[in-house]
């Protein structure tokens, strides 16, 4: 069996490693960034950047070379029409790796590998949809420890937080205001005690 020359082998066999890298590259070009183990991210980086170099060429032979590894036609189309032209004036360094700590459970070191420049239009739409799905129920929560001005600024940035600003702007009735018109039990007891003592003094005088 040939010895790997670019780091530890991924998977159980060379064929498994090729399929694993191809799937990771497909996910990277589709979403703009993925979270995986640090070892896989380091092996994926030169693999993905070589495919971006083929996409920058843009000819038919380069497209066929990429399609031997990336089998998703929509991802190949995105790679050649959006990602490749984006790096026309950049010679290498198309991705970055950010370490994000260890995974809970097996304590494997995790890393995020992503494309270095802005997302494409399709990737921005996907990220906005995921963000909207995650903040769908934020309107029911009241801001804790934040001022009304901060809530209004947040409402300008996110439409889903508009209800939060409206709820924060409404003045809440304090318990002191609600109990201002009602005499307390202590006051009632004191007044009753004073009346009984006065009546006792009048009876003794008579």
Swiss-Prot record:
The keyword Ribosomal protein applies. Residues 160-181, 189-200 have a biased composition (Low complexity). Keywords: Ribonucleoprotein, Ribosomal protein. The keyword Manganese does not apply. Residues 130-206 are annotated as: Disordered. GO terms for molecular function: structural constituent of ribosome. One of its GO terms (biological process) is translation. Residues 130-141 have a biased composition (Basic and acidic residues). GO terms for cellular component: cytosolic large ribosomal subunit. SUPFAM superfamilies: Prokaryotic ribosomal protein L17. Belongs to the bacterial ribosomal protein bL17 family. Part of the 50S ribosomal subunit. Contacts protein L32. NCBIfam families: L17 (TIGR00059). This is Large ribosomal subunit protein bL17. It comes from Frankia casuarinae (strain DSM 45818 / CECT 9043 / HFP020203 / CcI3). The gene is rplQ.
């Amino acid at each position: 069996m040939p010895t790997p020359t670019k780091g530890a082998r991924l998977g159980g066999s060379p064929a498994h490693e090729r399929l694993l890298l191809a799937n990771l590259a497909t996910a990277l070009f589709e979403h703009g960034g993925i979270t995986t183990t640090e070892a896989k991210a380091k092996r994926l980086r030169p693999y993905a950047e070589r495919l971006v170099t083929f996409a920058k060429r843009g000819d038919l032979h380069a497209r066929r070379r990429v399609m031997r590894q990336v089998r998703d036609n929509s991802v190949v189309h995105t790679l050649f029409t959006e990602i490749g032209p984006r790096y026309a004036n950049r010679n290498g360094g198309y991705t970055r790796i950010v370490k994000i700590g260890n995974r809970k459970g097996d304590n494997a070191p995790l890393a995020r590998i992503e494309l270095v420049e802005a997302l494409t239009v399709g990737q921005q739409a996907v990220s906005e949809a995921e963000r909207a799905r995650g903040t769908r129920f934020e309107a029911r929560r009241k801001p804790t420890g934040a001022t009304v001005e901060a809530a209004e600024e947040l409402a300008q940035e996110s439409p889903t937080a508009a209800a939060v600003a409206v709820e924060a702007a409404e003045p809440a009735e304090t318990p002191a205001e609600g109990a201002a018109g009602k005499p307390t039990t202590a006051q009632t007891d004191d007044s009753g005690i004073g009346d009984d003592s006065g009546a006792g003094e009048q009876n003794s005088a008579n």
